[in-house]
Amino acid sequence: MLVAAGQFAVTSVWEKNAEICASLMAQAAENDASLFALPEALLARDDHDADLSVKSAQLLEGEFLGLYGEKVNVT
């Protein structure tokens, strides 16, 4: 099994983050990766806002993950 990892500088604009993630995911798929991991959620923290990760979470049926399916043809 080929595993790919992607990393990028996370912004506060989820749409931009989603576009970058989709691009990285497409690159992994083009190289026949079976699993693609993004560690960014582990880094999404703010010392002044302990709930940032929870507040930033996206629904599985939402636009953020829906964008991946559109860009990479994954459902």
From Swiss-Prot:
SUPFAM superfamilies, sorted: Carbon-nitrogen hydrolase (SSF56317)
InterPro entries for this protein: C-N_Hydrolase_sf
Protein family per UniProt: Belongs to the carbon-nitrogen hydrolase superfamily. NIT1/NIT2 family.
Stated role: Pseudogene resulting from a nucleotide deletion that introduces a premature stop codon at position 66. This is the N-terminal fragment. The intact protein (AC A0A140NCB4) hydrolyzes deaminated glutathione (dGSH, 2-oxoglutaramate) to alpha-ketoglutarate (alpha-KG) and cysteinylglycine, has less activity against alpha-ketoglutaramate (a-KGM) and no activity on glutathione or L-glutamine. May function as a metabolite repair enzyme.
Protein name according to UniProt: Putative protein YbeH
Organismal lineage: Bacteria, Pseudomonadati, Pseudomonadota, Gammaproteobacteria, Enterobacterales
Gene: ybeH
